Amino acid sequence: MAMNKLNFLLLLAVCVSAFSVVMQQNQYRLNFTALDKAKKQEIALEQDYAQMRLQQARLANHEAIRAAAEKQNLHPPVSGNTFMVEHQR
């Protein structure tokens, strides 16, 4: 009778241990998947940031600004074209 109780306790301990191992492996897989997804998102964000920096550098180029101003027929303001707007209370 004592051997049956011992065998049952050992079987229970093995089952609990096996369940624990399965749960740990599952948690590891979930964490690894989340990490992989975060790394892919990081790479995509870095690519977007690099593209935005290139676009900013292109837009800040004085030659590009001058060309855009000429295309839109813009001219620097002169004193005859400017006027002051005052707020009356």
Curated annotation (Swiss-Prot):
| Cytoplasmic topological domain residue ranges | 1-6
What species is this protein from? Answer: Neisseria meningitidis serogroup B (strain ATCC BAA-335 / MC58)
How is the subunit organization of this protein annotated in UniProt?
Part of a complex composed of FtsB, FtsL and FtsQ.
Q: Which NCBIfam families did the record assign?
A: ftsL_broad (TIGR02209)
Q: How does it sit in the membrane?
A: Single-pass type II membrane protein
- Can you tell me which family this protein belongs to? Belongs to the FtsL family.
Keyword Metal-binding assigned:
no
List keywords of the entry alphabetically.
Cell cycle, Cell division, Cell inner membrane, Cell membrane, Coiled coil, Membrane, Transmembrane, Transmembrane helix
Q: Which cell locations does it reside in?
A: Cell inner membrane
Q: Name one GO biological process term.
A: FtsZ-dependent cytokinesis
Q: What is this protein called?
A: Cell division protein FtsL
